[in-house]
Structure formats: structure tokens, C-alpha cells
Swiss-Prot record:
Modified residues annotated as Phosphoserine in this record: 49, 68, 118, 153, 155
This enzyme's EC code(s): 3.6.5.-
GO molecular function: GTP binding; GTPase activity; translation elongation factor activity
Compositionally biased tracts (Polar residues): 190-207, 214-235
Protein name: HBS1-like protein
Assembly with partners or alone: Component of the Pelota-HBS1L complex, also named Dom34-Hbs1 complex, composed of PELO and HBS1L. Interacts with the SKI complex.
Matches recorded under InterPro entries: EFTu-like_2, GTP-eEF1A_C, HBS1-like_N, HBS1-like_N_sf, P-loop_NTPase, T_Tr_GTP-bd_dom, TRAFAC_GTPase_members, Transl_B-barrel_sf
Family: Belongs to the TRAFAC class translation factor GTPase superfamily. Classic translation factor GTPase family.
Protein purpose: GTPase component of the Pelota-HBS1L complex, a complex that recognizes stalled ribosomes and triggers the No-Go Decay (NGD) pathway. The Pelota-HBS1L complex recognizes ribosomes stalled at the 3' end of an mRNA and engages stalled ribosomes by destabilizing mRNA in the mRNA channel. Following mRNA extraction from stalled ribosomes by the SKI complex, the Pelota-HBS1L complex promotes recruitment of ABCE1, which drives the disassembly of stalled ribosomes, followed by degradation of damaged mRNAs as part of the NGD pathway.
Modified residues (N6-acetyllysine): 624
Region (G5): 447-449
Modified residues (Phosphothreonine): 233
Primary location group: cytoplasm
Length: 686
């Protein structure tokens, strides 16, 4: 109880004798002299406030801004188009014009930026922008150090630069400013802007460059003259979101890569046919893999007990692929021939990784089919259950028309002509049935391990006595590149998404149509989100532009990485790609065991998208050659039939009609681990 007595009898008044007042000065008990106080005491009253008051936003203004969107019930695509138009108009007008006026102008002119700008700029509110610019120029003029009387004697026309002009015309609009040249006189320090003729369609704007030129008046005259001499030569406008220079893509494509044409090549074939070893040895012989790296691969493969896989490790970079000895994902690299720049894609051959193979084949222009010439190995890959047949059908269904068949491992059969002719006879008949022309298919005997007949014609007497054809590299160089869809709207299908070291994130994929420049605004579908292309990387090198056929990496800002998935398609906001869950298609049924009926579940493979789907309707059976309807509303579809069906996906998918975009109108249907049909989109429902 003593402890409780101590607590009850404790005198708390001793602890509260003096209050500690923090944050303000308390006078001491003794006085201090004024001089000492001025030297050591900080006076808050005499000093200006270091913290400026934060301007608070008016809730009513925000409410009015949000209500302007509510008043106009717009769809998701129209909202994206509206945001794109507002961004372009703000880049030109700045924040001088309220957003509600800009929105009304855009909606009245049906999302036409040219007409909307003309309407807004004709109003009186643009005059406020002109008044502010004149005040800024006059302020910079006083800073020159001249007397106020001499400044007022000059006429206002000599001080204020002429308002520059911006012309918006044509289908593609060029956002830019015409910068007036500023000249300085030694005596008067006056500015003169040469007069330029302008058309009636030109729209007046105060250029920010004109303000910068006026601020240069604080510099000496010889400095201004030196800057004029440097600016006398025309310099291209920097590629940015605000000022972007339009380029001639076709002319730039001819200049790029020394006049060499771009070709996308995919290597396909049955598992263990030697695809990675063949192309890895080809890259080593071309010098794309140095000797030091190759020696490292040889030593590491020997330690792992896979000495024959040394060249395959050039393309199989992951530890799991090297450990299993099987390619699992599409390996991509680049090499050059005499007339071509080849983007090489090494596709997996195992049946478990057919979806990855479809992704690589969908991005290819031509293909190399690798078959094993060993006894029993070719038959295992070519007969039922092998991947040689399925890969051949897949690449033909995905638009590949030119094919080189590399009959590999010919050294194991001592370069026998009989074995080569046996393989070419069986494969040639099958490829002709699959839709390949005989003139577009070439058979080449090779050896991936020894390097025979890869980049130079073989000198082996066992081969030269009966084969006089091209080597593999010469055959690849003789492929004809397809016609690129440069004039069509921009389309890029995302094959990978990753976080960049800097701001934003990166997506990789092949540009299927159109072209892109740094600073372009893009629309991602189906997420329906807009962003800006901050940077473009082609073959690990930064570039300012890229066109159809290029495999690029885009650095994007203004969007959350969570909203982008593999399979999303980037397009221009003005001409977006269509998004739907139901569409009609014409399909060709392959060799299937179970007939296709209404409600049949399938897996839709479209570019890099893999989406579950259901066949909702069987509309009609078509004639293979003429396309005429032979039977309406069939109850089932069997192998070899050509039919018109309606499919429905679980989630929205971005599609294009085959007649408009052949690259984006093809798809494959798989069921239970095998490909059952190939098709093209004929109608998009919703």
C-alpha cells in the first residue's frame, strides 16, 4: 500500500510550475540591449514570408468542368477522340481558353481539329493572349538598360514581333510555328520582323519563339548577330509532342539500312529437328556471334553434358531452355544478307508450345521449315501427331506464302541423294495441298552442326556431285519482301510489356500497318486508354520513327502499366480499331476427330492473343473454290469443310476485317491441344 500512498500524496504542482511554449519567443527575466537583439535575435516581422499561400481550386469550377462532359453523353471511343482533340488544341492555345469552349467547338465540328481551332480563334478571348504577350515583350525591352524616354520614342510596330501563322490543312495536320527572324542594329537596338504573305485560311497565334527572340534584346548586339548567323541555316524542328516535323516515310525507308529491304523470317519444324543449332551456326558464320562468346557456350555445354547444343545456346538464352534442350519461347535476333535485313524468329517445335509458335508465325513474312533427314526422325515428325504437318498448315493459314525447306542432318545419312529425294517428294506433295505454290518452295540439304551449305555452297564432293542449287543464306536473300501497309492507319500488336528504368513503361511488338513518330498520341484497345510514345527503339537502337514491318519497343507515358496486357493493339485515336465479343468469320476445318456443332468451345489465337471462345452459330457451308453457299444452317461441320460461322469470346477482342487489314484479319482455332481450323474475319457484330 506504500506505493499507492506515494502516488496519492505526490505533488503534481511542481511539474506544472512553468509552461513550455514552443514556436514563439518568450521574454527572459533579464533585459537585452537593442544592438545585441538586432545581431542575435531573429525577427519574423521584418522578414518576408518564405512560404507562399497555396492557391486552392474552386470547387464550382471543377464541378462546371466535369459537368461539361456529363451534358454530352459520349461513348468510350468518342471520349478518346475528344481527349485527343483537346490535347492538340491545348498545345496550340495553352490555358488561355476555357475547356468548356474547346469542348463545345470540338463537338459542334464533329471532332475536326482544324475547324474547331478556326472557330475558337475567331472569338474575342484570343485577344487576351495577345495582350499578355505584348506586356511580356515590353517588360523584356525595359531590361536592356536604356532610358525610359528613349524606349518610348520607338514605335510599337518596331518592338512587337509580328504574330506568326499556323496552317492546318490536309488529312495529316502539322502542328508547328513559323519563327520570325530577329535582326539587331548596332545603334538603335531595334527589332525588325520581315513581312510574309499569309493565306486566308491561316490562323493567328502568338508564337512562344517570338517571345524568346524579344527577350534576347537584353544581350549585346554582337551576341545577337552571332546567334543570327547560326540560325540562318534551316534546322529541323525537334520531334516532340508539341512541335513535330512530318517526314516522308517512303523516302526515309529507302534511305534506311543502306537501301536493304526488311524481311521477317520465322524458323519452324518438329522438335529436335535442329532449328536452333542451324540458325545459331548461321549467325556464328556470319560474324554476329564473336569467337569468345562461342567458346564460352562450347565449354558450358560440355560441362552440362550437351556438347552438340553449343550453337543452339546462341538463340536459347534462358536457363530452362538450355537445361531441357528445348526451345520454349520465340527467340528474336537480326542479321543481314547482301540485299536484305532479316529479323529472325526461332519458334519452338514442341507441341506444348504451339501458342508461342503461332505468335511468332503471325509476325513473319517468310519461313524456313527445318526437317530431320535421319531415318525414323523425319517420319516421326511428318506422320500423324508430328509437328511438321501442323507447322506447315499454320504458317500458310497465317499468310506466309514463301517457304524454304532445310533438310537438316544430311551428314548423318552421308548426303544420300535418294534420302533427299524421298523427303522432298513427300513434303512437296503435302505443301502443295496446304496451299503453297511449287515455285515458292525450295528444298536445301544442310547440316547445322558442321555448317555445310549454310552461308556458302558446299565443297563436299558427296553433295556437289548431285546438288547444284543455292545455299541456305542465298535462298533467304532471294525471298521477295511483301508490300507494307504504310498508308493505312497505325496498328501495333503488343507481344510483351515490361517496366523501363526511367519514367513510363515499354511495350514490344510488330507494327502491322502505318507508321509512328516520337511524341505521337496513341490509343490502346480494348482498354480504351490514351498515352504518348516517348521513345522508339528498333534493334536495340533509339530511332525517331518506325514503319510497318518493324519490330519495335515503345516507351509510353501517360498510362498505367496495369491496364496493358499482351495482345492489346495500339492505334491512332482518330481511326481506332474495332473492339467486339461477337463476330462472323469464314473458317477452314482441318483434320478433326470430333465434328463441330453449335456451342463448340475453342481457343481463339489471334496475333499474340489467346482467348477462349464459343461457336454460337453455324450459318452456312461454302464451296472451297467459288465461295458459294452449298448448305444453310448446318447442324455440324466435319473435316475439310469451308463454312461461315459466328463466334463469341469471353472478353472483348480488338479485330479488323480481313478485307481491310489482312494482317489483322486472320486467326486460328485450337481445341484439346491441336489446331482444328483457320479463319478470316468477315463481319464484326458487337
Amino acid at each position: 500500500m506504500a506505493r499507492h500512498r506515494n502516488v496519492r500524496g505526490y505533488n503534481y504542482d511542481e511539474d506544472f510550475e512553468d509552461d513550455d511554449l514552443y514556436g514563439q519567443s518568450v521574454e527572459d527575466d533579464y533585459c537585452i540591449s537593442p544592438s545585441t537583439a538586432a545581431q542575435f535575435i531573429y525577427s519574423r516581422r521584418d522578414k518576408p514570408s518564405a512560404v507562399e499561400p497555396v492557391e486552392e481550386y474552386d470547387y464550382e469550377d471543377l464541378k462546371e468542368f466535369s459537368s461539361s462532359f456529363v451534358n454530352h453523353q459520349l461513348s468510350g471511343i468518342d471520349q478518346a477522340r475528344l481527349y485527343s482533340c483537346l490535347d492538340h488544341m491545348r498545345e496550340v492555345l495553352g490555358d488561355a481558353v476555357p475547356d468548356d469552349i474547346l469542348i463545345e467547338a470540338v463537338l459542334k465540328n464533329k471532332f475536326d481539329v482544324q475547324k474547331a481551332l478556326s472557330v475558337v480563334l475567331e472569338q474575342d478571348k484570343v485577344q487576351n493572349l495577345k495582350v499578355r504577350s505584348e506586356g511580356a515583350i515590353s517588360t523584356g525591352k525595359i531590361a536592356k538598360g536604356k532610358s525610359i524616354d528613349s524606349q518610348s520614342s520607338q514605335s510599337e510596330s518596331e518592338i512587337v514581333p509580328k504574330v506568326t501563322k499556323m496552317t492546318v490543312s490536309g488529312k495529316k495536320q502539322t502542328m508547328g510555328f513559323e519563327v520570325p527572324r530577329v535582326t539587331a542594329e548596332e545603334n538603335g537596338h531595334s527589332f525588325h520582323t520581315p513581312q510574309k504573305g499569309h493565306s486566308s485560311e491561316d490562323t493567328s497565334l502568338v508564337s512562344s519563339d517570338a517571345l524568346e527572340s524579344a527577350s534576347k534584346s537584353a544581350l549585346p548586339s554582337h551576341t545577337i548577330q552571332a546567334s543570327e548567323e547560326q540560325s540562318s541555316t534551316p534546322t529541323p524542328v525537334k520531334k516532340s509532342g508539341k512541335l513535330r516535323q512530318q517526314i516522308d516515310i517512303k523516302a526515309e525507308l529507302e534511305k534506311r539500312q543502306g537501301g536493304k529491304q526488311l524481311l521477317n523470317l520465322v524458323v519452324i519444324g518438329h522438335v529436335d529437328a535442329g532449328k536452333s543449332t542451324l540458325m545459331g551456326h548461321l549467325l556464328y558464320l556470319l560474324g554476329d556471334v564473336n569467337k569468345r562468346t562461342m567458346h564460352k557456350y562450347e565449354q558450358e555445354s560440355k560441362k552440362a553434358g550437351k556438347a552438340s547444343f553449343a550453337y543452339a545456346w546462341v538463340l536459347d538464352e534462358t536457363g530452362e531452355e538450355r537445361e531441357r534442350g528445348v526451345t520454349m519461347d520465340v527467340g528474336m535476333t537480326k542479321f543481314e544478307t547482301k540485299t536484305k535485313v532479316i529479323t529472325l524468329m526461332d519458334a519452338p517445335g514442341h507441341k506444348d508450345f504451339i501458342p508461342n509458335m503461332i505468335t511468332g508465325a503471325a509476325q513473319a513474312d517468310v519461313a524456313v521449315l527445318v526437317v530431320d533427314a535421319s531415318r525414323g526422325e523425319f517420319e516421326a515428325g511428318f506422320e500423324t501427331g508430328g509437328q511438321t504437318r501442323e507447322h506447315g498448315l499454320l504458317v500458310r493459314s497465317l499468310g506466309v506464302t514463301q517457304l524454304a525447306v532445310a533438310v537438316n542432318k544430311m551428314d548423318q545419312v552421308n548426303w544420300q541423294q535418294e534420302r533427299f529425294q524421298e523427303i522432298t517428294g513427300k513434303l512437296g506433295h503435302f505443301l502443295k495441298q496446304a496451299g503453297f505454290k511449287e515455285s515458292d518452295v525450295a528444298f536445301i540439304p544442310t547440316s547445322g552442326l558442321s555448317g555445310e551449305n549454310l552461308i556458302t555452297r558446299s565443297q563436299s564432293s558427296e553433295l556437289t556431285k548431285w546438288y547444284k542449287g543455292l545455299c541456305l543464306l542465298e535462298q533467304i536473300d532471294s525471298f521477295k519482301p511483301p508490300q507494307r501497309s504504310i498508308d493505312k492507319p497505325f496498328r501495333l500488336c503488343v507481344s510483351d510489356v515490361f517496366k523501363d528504368q526511367g519514367s513510363g513503361f515499354c511495350v514490344t511488338g510488330k507494327i502491322e500497318a502505318g507508321y509512328i513518330q516520337t511524341g505521337d498520341r496513341l490509343l490502346a484497345m480494348p482498354p480504351n486508354e490514351t498515352c504518348t510514345a516517348k521513345g522508339i527503339t528498333l534493334h536495340d537502337e533509339p530511332v525517331d520513327w518506325a514503319a510497318a514491318g518493324d519490330h519495335v519497343s515503345l516507351t509510353l507515358v501517360g498510362m498505367d502499366i496495369i491496364k496493358i496486357n499482351v495482345g492489346c493493339i495500339f492505334c491512332v485515336p482518330k481511326e481506332p480499331i474495332k473492339v467486339c465479343t461477337r463476330f462472323r468469320a469464314r473458317i477452314l476445318i482441318f483434320n478433326i476427330e470430333i465434328p463441330i456443332t453449335k456451342g463448340f468451345p475453342v481457343l481463339l489465337h489471334y496475333q499474340t492473343v489467346s482467348e477462349p471462345a464459343v461457336i454460337k452459330r453455324l450459318i452456312s457451308v461454302l464451296n472451297k473454290s467459288t465461295g458459294e453457299v452449298t448448305k444453310k444452317k448446318p447442324k455440324l461441320l466435319t473435316k475439310g469443310q469451308n463454312a461461315l460461322v459466328e463466334l463469341q469470346t469471353q472478353r472483348p477482342v480488338a479485330l479488323e476485317l480481313y478485307k481491310d487489314f489482312k494482317e489483322l484479319g486472320r486467326f486460328m482455332l485450337r481445341y484439346s491441344g491441336s489446331t482444328i481450323a483457320a479463319g478470316v474475319v468477315t463481319e464484326i457484330k458487337d
